[in-house]
From Swiss-Prot:
Database matches in InterPro entries: ARPC1, WD40/YVTN_repeat-like_dom_sf, WD40_repeat_dom_sf, WD40_rpt
Record flagged with keyword Repeat: yes
Keyword tags: Actin-binding, Cytoplasm, Cytoskeleton, Nucleus, Repeat, WD repeat
GO CC, any one term: nucleus
SUBUNIT field: Component of the Arp2/3 complex.
Molecular function as annotated in GO: actin filament binding
WD repeats (start-end): 6-45, 50-89, 140-179, 202-241, 244-284, 322-365
PROSITE patterns named among the record's database cross-references: WD_REPEATS_2, WD_REPEATS_REGION
Function text: Probably functions as a component of the Arp2/3 complex which is involved in regulation of actin polymerization and together with an activating nucleation-promoting factor (NPF) mediates the formation of branched actin networks. In addition to its role in the cytoplasmic cytoskeleton, the Arp2/3 complex also promotes actin polymerization in the nucleus, thereby regulating gene transcription and repair of damaged DNA.
Pfam families reported in the protein's UniProt record: WD40
Family note: Belongs to the WD repeat ARPC1 family.
Gene Ontology BP annotations: Arp2/3 complex-mediated actin nucleation
Name the record gives this protein: Actin-related protein 2/3 complex subunit 1A-A
């Protein structure tokens, strides 16, 4: 496990470049900081300053090396590097509320932006006019869209929102997409068509994160009522739900076709598996607990605690987990959704941790990624 403390401020979101030598993070403000690996250290190389509201989403396209950002200023920017300088291009989102989340499509020819305007902006580049334009998916979304994930076919888009529902839409844009083949989610895919809807008002909570599996047949999501859910399109849209005893999870991602990692307010990642019978199971917390020891607090730690945990108390408040506050995002570091070898977490404590499954398997008895 390698932990790096970037800041005292929370890291609201992050994204890696293709060869994992650079990470883009937002220190809970209107800026994006790009750090480059130099030996064992991370050195700040660039600051992207164009937004005038909190940045809420970052995604870095691996093939085209473009960064897309969105923020509370209702704007999105596509950043391209020229002669070592990152240049922004404004995207016309046509929204009247904050943008909340952004994600490049697998082919990198479009991206989707969720927002508080109860809609999803699907953006693509119009070469005739030399600008990025957007189309809106509105119905039947009833509240803020918190999370998005693309199906591997580059057309279907999963969205989790504050109306307690997870939906799968078609984001087919005839200007840039080839006609999609039929999938277990459905065969007819005109733009904006809702292919599936899960969740309800009687139970559930805000859907904080959604993730398709590598095949695209399974969709996982985590809600504010501490549940983890998986829908399987190949099993007639059957849904498996696990009500956990933990604090709410904020981020989820598939690390193999049947395993997923989720993390949130409990400050440590957790492994869940989904078997061929459609059963969803909690496997283990993936942290290596530190033994807490009684000690006097230094002046430096006192000030750090004021920033990190809003406390000045002398008693030792260090958590036994590596992260000292809620984890806000989980991403794959080494590998892909078919076979992930290492994954990354960032959190409100301003820290970034890279977790190695081989190391975790040697520490945690009986742990095996399916």
């Amino acid at each position: 496990m390698s932990l790096h403390q970037f800041l005292l401020e929370p890291i609201s979101c992050h994204a890696w470049n293709k060869d994992l030598t650079q990470i883009a993070i937002s220190p809970n403000n209107h800026e994006v900081h790009i750090y480059k690996k130099s030996g064992d250290q991370w050195v700040k190389g660039h600051e992207l300053k164009e937004h005038n509201g909190h940045i809420t989403g970052i995604d870095w396209a691996p093939k085209s090396d473009r960064i897309v950002t969105c923020g509370a200023d209702r704007n999105a920017y596509v950043w391209s590097q020229k002669d070592g300088v990152w240049k922004p291009t404004l995207v016309i989102l046509r929204i009247n509320r904050a943008a909340t989340f952004v994600k490049w499509s697998p082919l990198e020819n479009k991206f989707a932006v969720g927002s508080g305007a109860r809609l999803i902006s699907v953006c693509y580049f119009e070469s005739e006019n030399d600008w990025w334009v957007s189309k809106h998916i509105k119905k039947p979304i009833r509240s803020t869209v918190l999370s998005l994930d693309w199906h591997p076919n580059n057309v279907l888009l999963a969205a989790g929102s504050c109306d307690f529902k997870t939906r799968v839409f078609s984001a087919y844009i005839k200007e840039v997409d080839e006609k999609p083949a039929s999938t277990p989610w459905g065969s007819k895919m005109p733009f904006g068509q809702m292919m599936a809807e899960f969740g309800g008002v009687s139970s559930g909570g805000w859907v904080h994160s959604v993730s398709f599996s590598a095949s695209g047949n399974k969709l996982a999501w985590v809600s504010h009522d501490s549940t983890v859910s998986v829908a399987d399109a190949s099993k007639n849209m059957s849904v498996s739900q696990l009500k956990t005893e933990f604090l709410p999870l904020l981020s989820v991602i598939f690390v193999s076709e049947n395993s997923l990692i989720a993390a949130g307010h409990d400050c440590c990642p957790m492994l869940f598996t989904y078997d061929e019978h459609g059963s969803l199971t909690f496997v283990s917390k993936l942290d290596i607990p530190k033994q807490s020891t009684q000690r006097n607090i230094s002046a430096m730690e006192r000030f750090r605690n004021m920033d990190k945990r809003a406390t000045t108390e002398d008693r030792n408040t260090t958590l036994e987990t590596l992260h000292q506050n809620s984890i806000t995002q989980v991403s794959i570091y080494d590998g892909d959704k078919t076979e992930c070898r290492k994954f990354c977490t960032t959190g409100i404590d301003g820290a970034m941790t890279i977790w190695d499954f081989k190391t975790l398997e040697s520490y945690i008895q009986g742990l095996k990624i399916m």
